[in-house]
Protein backbone atom coordinates (compact mmCIF):
# COMPACT_ATOMS: atom_id res chain seq x y z
CA UNK A 1 0.00 0.00 0.00
CA UNK A 2 2.88 2.41 0.75
CA UNK A 3 4.24 1.84 -2.77
CA UNK A 4 0.80 2.54 -4.19
CA UNK A 5 0.50 5.78 -2.22
CA UNK A 6 4.00 6.82 -3.31
CA UNK A 7 3.16 6.37 -6.98
CA UNK A 8 -0.33 7.86 -6.84
CA UNK A 9 0.66 11.42 -7.63
CA UNK A 10 -2.61 12.54 -9.11
CA UNK A 11 -3.02 16.30 -9.09
CA UNK A 12 -5.68 18.45 -10.59
CA UNK A 13 -6.32 22.15 -10.68
CA UNK A 14 -9.10 24.62 -11.28
CA UNK A 15 -10.80 24.42 -14.69
CA UNK A 16 -8.81 21.31 -15.62
CA UNK A 17 -5.42 23.06 -15.77
CA UNK A 18 -2.58 22.32 -13.39
CA UNK A 19 -0.08 24.80 -12.12
CA UNK A 20 3.03 25.15 -14.26
CA UNK A 21 5.20 25.26 -11.15
CA UNK A 22 4.00 21.83 -10.07
CA UNK A 23 4.84 20.31 -13.45
CA UNK A 24 8.37 21.63 -13.18
CA UNK A 25 8.68 20.41 -9.58
CA UNK A 26 7.51 16.89 -10.49
CA UNK A 27 10.08 16.59 -13.27
CA UNK A 28 12.80 18.23 -11.16
CA UNK A 29 12.20 15.86 -8.21
CA UNK A 30 12.11 12.80 -10.45
CA UNK A 31 15.30 13.89 -12.18
CA UNK A 32 17.05 14.54 -8.86
CA UNK A 33 16.18 11.04 -7.64
CA UNK A 34 17.25 9.30 -10.85
CA UNK A 35 20.85 8.30 -11.38
CA UNK A 36 22.25 5.98 -14.01
CA UNK A 37 26.00 5.37 -13.75
CA UNK A 38 26.37 8.67 -11.88
CA UNK A 39 24.66 10.53 -14.70
CA UNK A 40 21.15 11.84 -14.22
CA UNK A 41 18.83 10.89 -17.04
CA UNK A 42 15.94 12.60 -18.76
CA UNK A 43 12.49 11.90 -17.35
CA UNK A 44 10.40 10.11 -19.96
CA UNK A 45 6.94 11.65 -20.22
CA UNK A 46 3.76 10.41 -21.85
CA UNK A 47 0.76 12.67 -22.39
CA UNK A 48 -2.71 11.21 -22.81
CA UNK A 49 -4.87 13.80 -24.52
CA UNK A 50 -1.94 15.71 -26.00
CA UNK A 51 -4.04 17.22 -28.79
CA UNK A 52 -6.68 18.83 -26.58
CA UNK A 53 -6.39 22.39 -25.26
CA UNK A 54 -4.82 21.47 -21.90
CA UNK A 55 -2.65 18.85 -23.62
CA UNK A 56 -1.26 21.44 -26.04
CA UNK A 57 -0.34 23.73 -23.15
CA UNK A 58 1.26 20.82 -21.33
CA UNK A 59 3.35 19.95 -24.41
CA UNK A 60 4.47 23.57 -24.68
CA UNK A 61 5.46 23.69 -21.00
CA UNK A 62 7.28 20.35 -21.02
CA UNK A 63 9.20 21.13 -24.21
CA UNK A 64 10.75 23.99 -22.25
CA UNK A 65 11.89 21.78 -19.37
CA UNK A 66 15.51 20.68 -19.58
CA UNK A 67 14.93 17.29 -17.91
CA UNK A 68 11.65 16.26 -19.59
CA UNK A 69 11.57 14.14 -22.73
CA UNK A 70 8.13 13.65 -24.24
CA UNK A 71 8.12 10.13 -25.67
CA UNK A 72 4.39 9.79 -26.31
CA UNK A 73 1.85 12.25 -27.63
CA UNK A 74 -1.37 10.33 -26.95
CA UNK A 75 -4.38 11.16 -29.08
CA UNK A 76 -7.36 9.11 -30.18
CA UNK A 77 -8.21 11.62 -32.91
CA UNK A 78 -4.82 11.91 -34.62
CA UNK A 79 -3.20 8.47 -34.39
CA UNK A 80 -0.17 8.17 -36.72
CA UNK A 81 -0.18 11.89 -37.61
CA UNK A 82 2.86 13.95 -36.67
CA UNK A 83 2.13 16.25 -33.74
CA UNK A 84 3.68 19.12 -35.68
CA UNK A 85 1.34 18.43 -38.63
CA UNK A 86 -1.63 18.77 -36.29
CA UNK A 87 -0.20 21.91 -34.68
CA UNK A 88 1.96 23.85 -37.12
CA UNK A 89 3.43 25.99 -34.34
CA UNK A 90 5.23 22.85 -33.13
CA UNK A 91 7.17 22.43 -36.41
CA UNK A 92 10.64 21.07 -35.60
CA UNK A 93 9.77 21.04 -31.89
CA UNK A 94 7.46 18.04 -31.71
CA UNK A 95 7.80 15.93 -34.84
CA UNK A 96 6.88 12.57 -33.30
CA UNK A 97 3.71 10.80 -34.39
CA UNK A 98 0.65 10.78 -32.17
CA UNK A 99 -0.02 7.37 -30.68
CA UNK A 100 -3.09 5.69 -29.25
CA UNK A 101 -3.40 6.72 -25.62
CA UNK A 102 -3.19 3.24 -24.10
CA UNK A 103 -2.29 3.83 -20.43
CA UNK A 104 -1.32 0.19 -19.78
CA UNK A 105 1.30 0.18 -22.56
CA UNK A 106 2.43 3.70 -21.77
CA UNK A 107 3.10 2.79 -18.12
CA UNK A 108 5.84 0.41 -19.29
CA UNK A 109 7.54 3.05 -21.46
CA UNK A 110 7.62 6.23 -19.35
CA UNK A 111 8.39 7.57 -15.88
CA UNK A 112 5.35 9.84 -15.62
CA UNK A 113 2.00 10.04 -17.42
CA UNK A 114 0.09 13.29 -17.67
CA UNK A 115 -3.60 12.95 -18.49
CA UNK A 116 -5.23 15.96 -20.14
CA UNK A 117 -8.63 14.38 -20.65
CA UNK A 118 -12.28 14.99 -19.73
CA UNK A 119 -13.65 13.92 -16.36
CA UNK A 120 -14.07 10.18 -15.99
CA UNK A 121 -11.42 8.98 -18.41
CA UNK A 122 -8.44 8.75 -16.04
CA UNK A 123 -10.54 7.17 -13.30
CA UNK A 124 -11.69 4.56 -15.81
CA UNK A 125 -8.14 3.69 -16.89
CA UNK A 126 -6.05 3.80 -13.73
CA UNK A 127 -5.47 0.62 -11.70
CA UNK A 128 -3.01 -0.65 -9.08
CA UNK A 129 -0.77 -2.30 -11.66
CA UNK A 130 -0.32 0.99 -13.52
CA UNK A 131 0.21 2.94 -10.29
CA UNK A 132 2.95 0.53 -9.24
CA UNK A 133 4.84 1.27 -12.47
CA UNK A 134 4.48 5.00 -13.07
CA UNK A 135 3.53 8.34 -11.56
CA UNK A 136 0.36 9.94 -12.89
CA UNK A 137 -0.53 13.62 -12.96
CA UNK A 138 -4.20 14.01 -13.85
CA UNK A 139 -5.50 17.37 -15.07
CA UNK A 140 -9.18 16.43 -14.72
CA UNK A 141 -11.27 16.50 -11.55
CA UNK A 142 -11.33 12.71 -11.17
CA UNK A 143 -9.26 12.72 -7.98
CA UNK A 144 -9.68 16.33 -6.88
CA UNK A 145 -13.09 16.04 -5.22
CA UNK A 146 -12.76 13.80 -2.17
CA UNK A 147 -16.50 13.12 -1.78
CA UNK A 148 -17.61 10.64 -4.45
CA UNK A 149 -21.28 11.64 -4.19
CA UNK A 150 -20.39 15.31 -4.82
CA UNK A 151 -18.24 14.31 -7.82
CA UNK A 152 -21.00 12.13 -9.28
CA UNK A 153 -23.69 14.77 -8.74
CA UNK A 154 -21.55 17.59 -10.16
CA UNK A 155 -20.30 15.75 -13.27
CA UNK A 156 -23.27 13.45 -13.78
CA UNK A 157 -21.09 10.34 -14.11
CA UNK A 158 -20.21 7.42 -11.85
CA UNK A 159 -16.68 7.56 -10.43
CA UNK A 160 -14.86 4.44 -11.63
CA UNK A 161 -11.95 4.41 -9.14
CA UNK A 162 -13.18 5.74 -5.80
CA UNK A 163 -10.68 3.50 -3.98
CA UNK A 164 -7.83 5.84 -5.02
CA UNK A 165 -9.43 9.17 -4.07
CA UNK A 166 -8.11 9.34 -0.50
CA UNK A 167 -4.57 8.56 -1.64
CA UNK A 168 -4.49 11.13 -4.43
CA UNK A 169 -2.49 14.31 -3.94
CA UNK A 170 -4.24 17.57 -4.79
Where are these regions (language model features)?
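Ala/Thr-enriched low-complexity intrinsically disordered regions
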Residues: 2, 12, 34-36
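Short hydrophobic targeting helices and cationic amphipathic motifs
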Residues: 8-10
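Intrinsic low-complexity/disordered segments
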Residues: 18, 25-28
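N-terminal Rossmann-like NAD(P) cofactor-binding subdomain of oxidoreductases
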Residues: 24-26, 37-170
Amino acid sequence: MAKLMENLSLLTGEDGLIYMQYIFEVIQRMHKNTKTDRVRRMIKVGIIGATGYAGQELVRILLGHKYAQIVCYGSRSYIDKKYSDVFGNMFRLADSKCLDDNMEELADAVDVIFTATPQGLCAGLVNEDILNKVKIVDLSADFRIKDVSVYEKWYGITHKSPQFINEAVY
